[in-house]
């Protein structure tokens, strides 16, 4: 049995959950998300204690894999619609900067052109002091994916550390060539 899957999910007071067959719809103050549960997993709601429980309908390897996965995905959806998720990026380098143009993010990171990043409709980008970018949204996977796409534009280089990095990410710097 999955150690993660057998844990109950606590529901905050401001969350509404509707379960119709294998579809779970979660509504909260930040928005609304839905998820289709695989047939190998069954979900039950305890309205007295405000908890959700997930059970396996079969006892095979695939059901074991999906048990913990479904519980984690539903828990992340609940956190997303109640609190939201955010990732922070830092830009380091001489002349490297970012700015917002409407919803689009404009990056000047050492290329001959400005790189334009167009976020999906439910992702909010914020820029503070031209060198830090905050990505906010209700879907954890989507927030992380957009952050990874922005970082991939100019990843930190190993000699001086110039580039786009996650906040508090440590870069192992290499020692340059020694002179003769």
Curated annotation (Swiss-Prot):
Q: Which PROSITE patterns match?
A: RIBOSOMAL_L6_1
Q: What broad class describes the main subcellular location of this protein? A: plastid
Q: Does the keyword Ribosomal protein apply?
A: yes
Q: Name one GO biological process term.
A: cytoplasmic translation
Q: Which UniProt keywords apply?
A: Chloroplast, Plastid, Ribonucleoprotein, Ribosomal protein, RNA-binding, rRNA-binding
- Give Gene Ontology CC terms: chloroplast; cytosolic large ribosomal subunit
Instruction: Give this protein's Gene Ontology molecular function annotations.
Output: rRNA binding; structural constituent of ribosome
HAMAP family tied to this protein: Ribosomal_uL6_B
What is the recorded name of this protein?
A: Large ribosomal subunit protein uL6c
Q: Per the UniProt entry, what species is this protein from, by scientific name? A: Gracilaria tenuistipitata var. liui
**Gene name of the record:** rpl6
């Amino acid at each position: 049995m999955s150690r993660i899957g057998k844990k109950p999910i606590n529901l905050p007071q401001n969350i509404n959950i509707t379960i119709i067959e294998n579809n779970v719809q979660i509504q909260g103050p930040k928005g609304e998300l839905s998820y289709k549960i695989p047939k190998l997993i069954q979900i039950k709601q305890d309205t007295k204690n405000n908890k959700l429980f997930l059970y396996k309908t079969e006892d095979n390897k695939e059901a074991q894999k999906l048990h913990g996965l479904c519980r984690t995905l539903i828990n992340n959806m609940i956190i997303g619609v109640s609190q939201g998720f955010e990732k922070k990026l830092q830009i380091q380098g001489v002349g490297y900067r970012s700015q917002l143009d409407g919803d689009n993010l404009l990056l000047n990171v050492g290329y001959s052109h400005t790189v334009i990043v167009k976020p999906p409709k439910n992702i909010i980008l914020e820029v503070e002091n031209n060198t830090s970018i905050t990505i906010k949204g209700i879907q954890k996977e989507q927030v992380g994916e957009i952050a990874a796409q922005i970082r991939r534009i100019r990843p930190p280089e190993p000699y001086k550390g110039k580039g786009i990095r996650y906040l508090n990410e440590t870069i192992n710097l290499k020692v340059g060539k020694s002179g003769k």
